[in-house]
Amino acid sequence: MALVLFLTFVPATFAQGAGKSSQYGLIFDEMMRFIKTYYIDEVDDKALFEGAMKGMFDAIGDPHSVFMTEQEMDSASDSAMGQFGGVGLYISKYSADVGYDEDRLPYVRVVSPIEDTPAYRLGIKAGDYIVKVDGKSTEAMTLDEVAKIMRGKPGTTVSITFLRDKNIVFTYDIERANIEVPSVKSDLIEKNIGYLRITNFAANTPDKVKEALDNFSKKRIKYLVIDLRSNPGGVLESAIEIADFFLDDGVIVSVKSKIPSWNQVYNASKKVKISKSVPIAVLIDRGSASAAEILSAALSDNGRAVLIGETTYGKGSVQQLRSLGKDGFKLTMGKYYTPKDINIDKVGIPPEKEVKDRDLTDEEKASYKKLIEEYRIQKFVKDNPKPSDLQIDTFIQQLKSEGIVMEDRILRKLVRNEVNFNNNDSPVYDLEFDVVLQEAVRMLKSGEIKAK
């Protein structure tokens, strides 16, 4: 039987009648001293401090407000610089206390895969859950704990178990790679349609976008597609500056804080870089978040573009990163509102034209799981690094003869994605298989989307 000796701990601060904030601060100091004095073994001051800070931020119940250790601050810096070692996923986790989504499972969820990375190549999608990392359940892990395990030296592997549609479970041993986060890609579709892909909003993204728009202007494009799918956001100011390239007046976004003097309204300032006669389609999905939603709403609410795709992620809060010596923290210090004065946090922005690839049937889901578990696509491409159309068709027929139930179009896309990744030759856009892009092009050319 354990022997428990009860000591009475009465903080002097209770007798002093201090205000609550200062009172709790003094209690914290006294608690630290009490533990260090009476705990049977030696106690590490830094470990106590970090534990207390993490508990403080956890008590807020906001997944975007977190205490960050020195290592986590370094990782955040690597991400901001656009390069780190990992698998290539933006992830999130909501506390059960927040009540964000009753149907949401208590695991880390993929916000979006980063293009041209190991996770992207394997077909990981926005909305997939990460239920295990290296065999350990993520249910009780913090977001940072999961991220820390997934990151590592390029060339090493991490085992990740995913859950899709709440009934497809699959595990990959993923080789970590040097993850570079490109923010802008651009090209022409059919010579007169500009295609602008923004994958995230870094500090230098506006310069890259301006360069692409200047090139489009020289080519005298008639239409423009801005693709913000699987864009997790980034720097608020970058989204505002880019919105200004398309608007000559009107509100871009407003930010409201607890401190009234911090409230700001950002207006367009006549820095338009593309002709107002060019109709614009903006592609969005549930992986479009934060700054991507700001740009989408700014263009849509001001009548400059039509949104096509799926309802966005729904992150309408603004965080600031602050340092505490070598440690630091990220705190939600405001919420942003669209030009129509709507905060889309936990709601998202619906498209004006809903388009998405159809969901897989139960039979197709089972076939997809089988392909993943048996690495069939990867093995085929390893044996046929540059397969001909005939070889791909023959492979597809072989899969079907073995009981794989899936459209030829989907199987062909899986093969081509693997080939492109292995050859480091991913196309800027995919008009053959991308049904959302196909619809955007159709609507632009038919005149359903008009310049405003």
Predicted regions and their residues:
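C-terminal "post-core" interaction segments
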Residues: 185-225, 229-452
